[in-house]
Amino acid sequence: MSAQVLSVSLPSEIIYVSGTVNGTAYTWTLIEGAWTATVERAADDTYVVAPTAVTAAGVSTNYALTLYYGLLNLITDRTHADVVKQTDKGFYNASDLNRVGAAVQYVAERFAEQGYAVAVSPKTDWIASDIPTASELETYRQNLATLRALLSVMPTTPEALDSMAGLTYTEANSIEQILLDLDALLTNAALAWYQSGELFAGEV
């Protein structure tokens, strides 16, 4: 059974956390300021987290959030109809922020593995009650712009956004398409390196 380590940032006054991930109870431990749990890896790399946090004063709070890992769940097919019909894709919320944050982290790690210097700071544990500040949204936007600028992208790759203000469904699609394109380019670069190196030179 493969495992995945989840990490959630909660208020500093929290001293104990319990709860479930995808319906199963796990042990949570405070490590370097974040509450972590090692869980069974989900096939789709999606984790529905329902922690209960307790303060030293005995105040208990229930949280609910969804964490994403990798790129399996990126969304690029939002439509005007989603907005009009108010479907899940017609709103931009904590789930979207977490999905993109996790994908930014994943792509940044791939860049680092190929020797790129990467400076991004994605947040992946937004909860439904969070209201992002202007500064947090700018960091969110800048993370994407930073990654996109590291490579010569495809002609069809969307431009990075200039602002998160008044985000449209097409811009939301573009954010996630950029990440998919970067991932594909990194894969192609890795394959090209292997094919031009010694892997096919009969020495392996």
Task: Tell where the protein language model's regions lie, with residue ranges.
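Edge beta-strands of extracellular beta-sandwich domains
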Residues: 27, 57-70
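Structural beta-strand segments of beta-rich domains
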Residues: 2-8
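Extracellular "spike/adhesin" assembly and maturation modules
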Residues: 71-204
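Surface-exposed, short loops/turns at beta-strand junctions within beta-sandwich domains
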Residues: 38-47
